[in-house]
Amino acid sequence: MALHVLEALQHGVSVEAVLSDPKVAPALGERRRRQAEMDTVISDSTEVIDRLAIARLEGRGLRSNGYHVTAQVGDDCDACLVVHGDVGASFGEQDRYPVSASFYTNSFLHTAGGLYDLTRLATRFDPDGGGHANACGCRIQALETGTRVDRVVTEGDIEANLAAWLEMWAER
């Protein structure tokens, strides 16, 4: 599809003609439908706490990036945290992946960089977590009394990870 669109544009076909092309229009309609569905899911699954938007997408088989979340929440958040994946899953399982968290600065609001180094959150419990200060991630970790333990992650662990991250965020 992308090659078809690119070749049409290279041959001088107008954008309007490309968008109404019988090969493109149905795919574009489907993409718009999926986008509207994701907008609804994000809206229904997101809570803003202390200017941190928390989107709970775990167990839904859906993934979204934080830019989508921060675009929807707008100026009410300085950053977002997206929880996604499947509780109890591990790497290598077909159609399932470990429950994880992604962190993003609201770059629509903070164009020169965020107010907080989000890698601090991503590396708090996960030694493999990290990324960029304004966009990073980690796996949710199994915790007992705030310490990482070697066992399958539960729903309670998601809550424990979130609670610790919210404490850290509050100290920014």
PLM region spans:
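Glycine-rich, Lys/Arg-enriched anion-binding loops that position phosphate/diphosphate groups
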Residues: 1-76
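Glycine-rich, acidic loop segments that terminate in or are immediately followed by a histidine
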Residues: 53-172
